[in-house]
Design a protein with these regions (language model features):
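Membrane-proximal intracellular helices of multi-pass ion channels
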Residues: 1-478
Length: 478
């Protein structure tokens, strides 16, 4: 029996175990909550709790509540690691409010189930099968064995990366802001960057514009964003097989390939489109190295991070549309980022390639990708695209009297659904109804369109109904 066949049987056994658990009947005849629904409700509960905490007067720098809408919007953006905001966190939030915001970012980025597992391990409680299934779902893993150990490794790795990033940022921020504030800004920025959140405490909506000619700051943030968006499973596999890269899994190879293409291609495109723009990379005093750094930073940050080293509104429309495409793709599975994910794009392109070449199978790097994966990639992309189009149309109606361009509305919508957090229109300047509309969009982007759809719609199990076959008939396509 080959290795792939054994893996397929193992994966089928795990899926059957999950289905059996979901179908198991309780003594009162009630089915336990499905993992997808539990995750959706868990994130929703975390958002509501965070919104209430941020609404407290103690969370405000002025001692008065920032208001429920602003508190809820900020909590949604933080838990969904987006970065869109109606407030200036560094100016409007007290130290308590900033700590709450940082905790929401960290829990939202690494996953609340991972934190719950850590808590149960620390107090010595046994991790139940249901908790292991939820942990597996939240971390986008197929297996159940070793999940607790894997989640603890994730925590250790995340902490090490964030502290290293904070130490590097402190080399520039401490001399500029003083020891106490500089260290706090370094830690907050490092966590926000690794979690692909995009929140900052520098104030005045400037994000990292003040550091556009500070290579150490920008490259440190680039590294944190890339590591957070790569996915923990990929990082672990690279560490395990660092001396034998030929043994890497198909998943890791696709992640690295797509990420490399988007990074190099996106950086080059931004450099060509914005290199002569006096409002962005072509401003006076920018050296060639500054332009290269700014181009790479824009190509990386629009992959769901949300930090800005150039004014997003001042970019050319062509650059905004390019950024929308990169935001829509986003990061990789089992990462802190959003978007449809790099592997989804890879599966789509490989599916199209197989259709054009007249092949029945989807292949890459000498391996075959299942038809189910191809169907899921198409479904995920279709659902996400539908939401982008629907919300963009709604925003264009709501903002028709405010003079916001369609390009900026598309940018805002894609930024929300991909949990990126970049804004060209200025989220705080939109109508209240538009701001409310963006909140469920950020939530959708964090839990995932397919996860939310399966949580709301009862899926048919592999029963008699699924085994019914109808007569096949061809229709015309294209």
């Amino acid at each position: 029996m080959g290795k792939n066949e054994r893996n397929d049987q193992k994966g089928s056994a795990i899926l059957n175990e999950k289905d059996a658990f979901s179908n198991r009947r309780e003594p009162l005849g009630r089915r336990p909550m499905s993992p997808g629904r539990a995750l959706c409700l868990g994130f929703l509960a975390l958002i509501l709790l965070g919104g209430l905490l941020l609404t407290l007067p103690a969370a405000s720098a002025g001692g008065e509540s920032i208001g429920f809408l602003k508190g809820l919007f900020t909590a949604t953006s933080a838990v969904c690691v987006t970065g869109l905001s109606l407030i200036e966190a560094g100016r409007d939030l007290s130290l308590f409010g900033q700590i709450v915001l940082l905790c929401l970012i960290q829990v939202g980025g690494l996953g609340f189930m991972a934190f719950a597992t850590l808590g149960m391990v620390l107090i010595g409680r046994r991790i139940s099968l249901h908790s292991r299934i939820l942990l597996s779902e939240s971390m986008n893993q197929n297996g159940l064995s070793g999940m607790v150990r894997l989640s603890l490794w994730f925590f250790a790795m995340a902490l090490a990366i964030e502290l290293t990033g904070a130490a590097l940022l402190a080399l520039r921020l401490v001399p500029r802001y003083g020891t106490a504030r500089g260290l706090w800004l370094s830690l907050f920025t490092a966590v926000s960057a690794f979690c692909n959140a995009g929140f900052d405490l520098f104030g005045n909506g400037s994000s990292l514009l003040a550091f556009r000619q500070e290579p150490l700051v920008l490259w440190t943030v680039i590294g944190l964003i890339q590591l957070g968006g790569m996915g923990f499973a990929v990082m672990l596999e690279l560490l395990r097989h660092r001396k034998s890269l030929g043994r890497l899994s198909l998943h890791t190879k696709l992640v690295l390939a797509v990420n490399g293409i988007l990074l190099l291609g996106g950086s080059l495109a931004v450099f060509l489109l914005e290199g002569q723009n006096p409002a962005t990379l072509g401003r006076e005093g920018m050296t060639l190295w500054d332009k290269v750094t700014g181009s790479v930073f824009q190509a990386v940050t629009c992959r769901t991070a949300g930090f800005a080293a150039v004014s997003q509104d001042a970019m050319n429309d062509s650059t905004k549309l390019l950024s929308c495409l990169m935001m829509f793709v986003g990061a990789s599975p089992a990462s802190t980022g959003g978007g449809i994910k790099t592997t989804t794009l890879a599966a789509l392109l490989l599916l199209v390639h197989s259709v054009v070449r007249g092949r029945d199978r989807i292949t890459a790097f000498g391996k075959e990708i299942s038809q189910e994966t191809g169907r899921r990639a198409v479904a995920l992309t279709f659902i996400a695209t539908s939401f982008v189009l629907a919300v963009t149309c709604a925003l264009s109606i709501l903002e028709r009297r405010h003079g916001v361009s369609l390009t900026n509305l598309v940018f805002e919508t894609v930024s929300a659904v991909s949990t990126t957090g970049l804004s060209a229109a200025g989220t705080g300047t939109l109508r209240r109804s538009s701001q409310i509309l963006l909140m469920p969009l950020m939530y959708l982007g964090r839990v995932g369109p397919l996860t939310l759809a399966t949580a709301l719609i009862r899926r048919e199990r592999d029963g008699a109904r699924n085994r019914v076959h109808f007569p096949e008939e061809k229709i015309m396509i294209g």
